UniProtKB/Swiss-Prot annotation:
<feature type="region of interest" description="Peptidyl-alpha-hydroxyglycine alpha-amidating lyase">
    <location>
        <begin position="395"/>
        <end position="716"/>
    </location>
</feature>
<dbReference type="Pfam" id="PF01082">
    <property type="entry name" value="Cu2_monooxygen"/>
</dbReference>
<keyword id="KW-0186">Copper</keyword>
<dbReference type="InterPro" id="IPR014783">
    <property type="entry name" value="Cu2_ascorb_mOase_CS-2"/>
</dbReference>
<comment type="similarity">
    <text>In the C-terminal section; belongs to the peptidyl-alpha-hydroxyglycine alpha-amidating lyase family.</text>
</comment>
<dbReference type="InterPro" id="IPR014784">
    <property type="entry name" value="Cu2_ascorb_mOase-like_C"/>
</dbReference>
<keyword id="KW-0511">Multifunctional enzyme</keyword>
<comment type="subunit">
    <text>Monomer.</text>
</comment>
<feature type="glycosylation site" description="N-linked (GlcNAc...) asparagine">
    <location>
        <position position="465"/>
    </location>
</feature>
<feature type="compositionally biased region" description="Polar residues">
    <location>
        <begin position="743"/>
        <end position="755"/>
    </location>
</feature>
<feature type="repeat" description="NHL 1">
    <location>
        <begin position="467"/>
        <end position="508"/>
    </location>
</feature>
<dbReference type="InterPro" id="IPR001258">
    <property type="entry name" value="NHL_repeat"/>
</dbReference>
<keyword id="KW-0968">Cytoplasmic vesicle</keyword>
<comment type="function">
    <text>Bifunctional enzyme that catalyzes amidation of the C-terminus of proteins. Alpha-amidation is present at the C-terminus of many endocrine hormones and neuropeptides and is required for their activity. C-terminal amidation also takes place in response to protein fragmentation triggered by oxidative stress, promoting degradation of amidated protein fragments by the proteasome. Alpha-amidation involves two sequential reactions, both of which are catalyzed by separate catalytic domains of the enzyme.</text>
</comment>
<feature type="binding site">
    <location>
        <position position="105"/>
    </location>
    <ligand>
        <name>Cu(2+) A</name>
    </ligand>
</feature>
<feature type="disulfide bond">
    <location>
        <begin position="225"/>
        <end position="332"/>
    </location>
</feature>
<feature type="binding site">
    <location>
        <position position="170"/>
    </location>
    <ligand>
        <name>Cu(2+) A</name>
    </ligand>
</feature>
């Protein structure tokens, strides 16, 4: 009997170990199976996520589609990311949409480097990208394919291009999914590794604050921005509104002359149409857009928003420009000056007729079957979200570009910074001269004339990427440089506090084109300045403004040839400064599309804004975070104001830092400090259209470059402990109703792979465990019956008690009651890969950095490797 028990136990152990082999397969094999399952789209979708090579060409195509989704609510925005299959520089040269307006309201294709989520797809309300994103393609209303001109492409990959595509689809009416079908809307892009001489980009002009009153027959939404980047050549345009839009028109305004870029009804297929006539847009031109709406039939006001009941006013201009200084994406969101639009061509006010049949088809395709009462109630109760077409609600944080070598430039006290029309950084510094307590007497007369002017070049033109000095000027001309501004023609406008003068210096000239003020003579009349600090130039009129200054608390306006026009401002008379009072107006910036001039009122710790033409006070921006001083201010298109404050006074705790502000309401959007060195006296700030910001420090003798980065990876320190902010992750969890499978293509293979393995094992082992637990019981019962039958034959009825004991021993051991027996419940509950919840709890410590010892990482890259692209022929 002991021998029989031993054999039975060995048989059970064999079966159990066989069970573990079936249940807990190799993580490598499971992960391979997971990879294979993600290599193709849903069975309901045609196509593949892998690149498809073009026969006889180095080009390849990539299907970018939704992975078979079924929205459950109307006005759902879903996003999905796709990794560029190669890291090398490449170019998108063609788009082919796969979409139908009966299902999708519109779709957009973004380019970026850090998608907002690693999921297979996600709710776009959690964001599209965590870094700067650019629109590469847009589709709506059954628009036909877009064909790029020969030699033109959207740059992707490499050092400066996007590594990810993010597809966003707006699903309008959920009634289209009553049959529960799975949607695979998307676009096929054709990519070539061959370098394109011309780089494509998109200029987006859009309104953020248009209101369409109910019943009003004609409502105009006007947008205009001064263009100050290298020349672009528009070749296609696309318009976008919702139901109330009648026509959208875009123009180039040059020296008062309006030239049509494109005009179309937004109720027709929203494709990219060819521009009316070939033209170029150069620095100094104005890009103006008008959307014509009607409020007829509405019972309540209609606002800008992302739902079908809201409205939008968007004009996309697809352009190309020389690859040497290409910019892939630009925006304009400023409300147009009414005086400018008094001269808009009448054609912009004429709706484009759309046949009733076409209109009905569009309405049915959008699923706009809402009653007026529903529209009125929803408009009143819902705070409309802005559609992702706007690309403005990105959580952007500025961080120092630590790879930029410009911080180590050998310069003196940096007093002024600006960007020229070619987007080069221009630095105005004091060389070996220093402003200290011995520089002036009590009457503000400069005391160190005997040492002569600064002999080295005080104006340096620096490459914004490499910090290489491209050009230098300003030798033997200045004593104590201060402010710097560059106009649309590339002229330098500078001030010298020792000379008490303002200079206009040509970019290619050694001698000034214009000089205002009397050298070394401070004064307060119209022909004198007293330590003037800065200049701002109105790009439309050419008039310029002088902040004067350390000892005159005023702003002066002059004509382009230097004739005095007007002045305003007075010295602060109390601890509660009134509007228009200054205590060192230290820095100026033009808000040209608003017709405003903003002043950094340094010692009053605030920013004041005025109507440029009249000097009338508009508003002030003041925050406790500013502390007691605001040194400089700079405006960038898109409604963002940048500023830097001063070092805290003794006993104050306000840090010296940079600020990113919402110009419309003055709110602080972000603060930033350098990673290398420290701010000592940040004296000037310059902001580019692409979100890049430069700060010059007069005490640290340094210039820093700050670039936008993903805000959710920003860390804050509390009591010396660094804490990672995960707000954005929490938002993902809140918005997602059902978590789709994880998409490994966003670089999270190491972190997510164990989870995939365990889930797969758990799914396989459940059925096997139940089955294999039954089999040994049946086998053991059969063995027990066989043994009993043998003993009955050998010993007859006397063995009844022994057989009961033996049988109880075997079954008792199986039940875990016998001492030294095998407890199956304990065995499975403690075996690797199994727990009461189906799998072991994963370690959360260090999972982002470390791999399993058993995995060398080689296999985890299979999913992302693309077939090698044939080299470009040298012929």
């Amino acid at each position: 009997m002991d021998m029989a028990s031993l054999i039975s136990s060995l048989l059970v152990l064999f079966l159990i170990f066989q069970n573990s082999c079936y249940c807990f397969r190799s993580p490598l094999s499971v992960f391979k199976r997971y990879e294979e399952s993600t290599r193709s789209l849903s069975n309901d979708c045609l196509g593949t996520t892998r690149p498809v090579m073009s026969p006889g060409s180095s080009d390849y195509t990539l299907d970018i589609r939704m992975p078979g989704v079924t929205p459950t609510e109307s006005d759902t925005y879903l996003c999905k990311s796709y990794r560029l299959p190669v890291d090398d520089e490449a170019y998108v040269v063609d788009y082919r949409p796969h979409a139908n307006m009966d299902t999708a309201h519109h779709m957009l294709l973004f380019g970026c480097n850090v998608p907002s989520s690693t999921d297979d797809y996600w709710d776009c309300s959690a964001g599209t990208c965590n870094d700067k994103s650019s629109i590469m393609y847009a589709w709506a209303k059954n628009a036909p394919p877009t064909k790029l001109p020969e030699g033109v492409g959207f740059q992707v990959g490499g050092k400066s291009g996007s590594r990810y595509f993010v597809l966003q689809v707006h699903y309008g009416d959920v009634k289209a999914f009553q049959d529960k079908h799975k949607d695979c809307t998307g676009v096929t892009v054709r990519i070539t590794p061959e370098k394109q001489p011309l780089i494509a980009g998109i200029y987006l002009s859009m309104s953020l604050n248009t209101v369409v009153p109910p019943g009003q027959e004609v409502v105009n939404s006007d947008i205009a921005c001064l263009y100050n980047r290298p020349t672009i050549h528009p070749f296609a345009y696309r318009v976008h509104t919702h139901q109330l839009g009648q026509v959208v028109s875009g123009f180039r305004v040059r020296h008062g002359k309006w030239t049509l870029i494109g005009r179309q009804s937004p109720q027709l297929p929203q494709a990219f149409y060819p521009v009316e006539h070939p033209l170029e847009i150069s620095p100094g031109d104005i890009i103006a857009t008008r959307c014509l709406f009607t409020g007829k039939g509405r019972m309540s006001a209609t606002y800008i928003g992302g739902t079908a009941k809201d409205e939008m006013c968007n004009l996309y201009i697809m352009y190309y420009m020389d690859a040497a200084h290409a910019t892939s994406y630009m925006t304009c969101v400023q409300t147009g000056n009414p005086k400018l639009f008094e001269n808009i061509p009448e054609i912009a006010n004429v709706p484009i007729p759309v046949s009733p049949d076409m209109m009905m088809m569009m309405m049915m395709g959008h699923g706009h079957h809402h009653t007026e009462a529903e529209a009125e109630t929803n408009t009143a109760l819902q705070q409309p979200k802005r559609e992702e077409e706007e690309v403005l609600n990105q959580d952007v944080h500025l961080e120092e570009d630590t790879d930029w070598p410009g911080v180590n430039l050998k310069v003196g006290q940096v007093s002024g910074l600006a960007l020229d029309p070619k987007n080069n950084l221009v630095i105005f510094h004091r060389g070996d001269h220093v402003w200290d307590e011995n520089s002036f007497d009590r009457n503000f007369v400069y005391q160190q004339r005997g040492i002569g002017p600064i002999q080295e070049s005080t104006i340096l033109v620096v490459d914004p990427n490499t910090s290489k000095v491209l050009k230098s000027t300003g030798q033997n001309l200045f004593f104590l440089p201060h402010g710097l501004t560059i106009d649309r023609d590339g002229n330098y406008w500078v001030t010298d506090v020792a000379l008490h003068q303002v200079f206009k210096v040509g970019a290619e000239k050694e001698t000034p084109l214009l000089v205002l003020g009397r050298a070394f003579q401070p004064g307060s009349d119209r022909k004198h300045f007293c330590q003037p600090t800065d200049v701002a130039v109105d790009p439309i009129t050419g008039n310029f403004f002088v902040a004067d200054g350390y000892c005159n608390s005023r702003i002066m306006q002059f004509s382009p040839n230097g004739m005095f026009i007007m002045q305003w401002g007075e010295e602060t008379s109390s601890n509660l400064p009134r509007p228009g009072q200054f205590r060192i107006p230290h820095s100026l910036t033009m808000i040209s599309d608003q017709g405003q001039l903003c002043v950094a009122d340094r010692e009053n710790g605030r920013i004041q804004c005025f109507h440029a033409k009249t000097g009338e006070f508009v508003k002030q921006i003041k925050h406790q975070e500013f502390g007691r001083e605001v040194f400089a201010v700079s405006y960038a298109p898109g409604g963002v104001l940048y500023a830097v404050n001063g070092k805290p006074y003794y006993g104050d705790s306000t840090p010296v830092q940079g600020f990113m502000l919402n110009f419309s309401n003055g709110d602080i959007l972000d603060t930033f400090i350098p990673a290398r060195k420290n701010f000592e006296m940040p004296h000037d700030i310059a902001a580019g259209d692409d979100g890049t910001v430069y700060v010059g420090d007069a005490h640290a003798n340094a210039v820093w470059k700050f670039s936008p980065s993903k805000a959710e990876h920003r860390s804050v320190k509390k009591a010396g402990i660094e804490v990672e902010e995960i707000t954005e992750t929490e938002i993902f969890e809140t918005h997602m109703r059902s978590r789709p499978k994880t998409n490994e293509s966003v670089g999270q293979q190491t972190q997510e792979k164990p989870s995939v393995v365990q889930e797969s094992s758990a799914g396989v082992s459940f059925v096997l465990i139940i089955t294999l637990l039954i089999i040994p019981v049946v086998v053991l019962i059969a063995i027990a019956i066989f043994i009993r039958w043998r003993k009955v034959r050998m010993y007859g009825g006397d063995i009844g008690h022994k057989s009961e004991s033996s049988s109880g021993g075997i079954l008792g051991k199986l039940r875990g009651k016998g001492s030294g027996g095998l407890n199956l419940g304990t065995f499975f509950a403690t075996h690797k890969g199994y727990s009461r919840k189906g799998f072991d709890r994963l370690s959360t410590e260090g999972s982002d950095q470390e791999k399993d010892d058993d995995d060398d990482g080689s296999d985890s890259e299979e999913e992302y490797s693309a077939p090698p692209i044939p080299p470009v022929s040298s012929s």
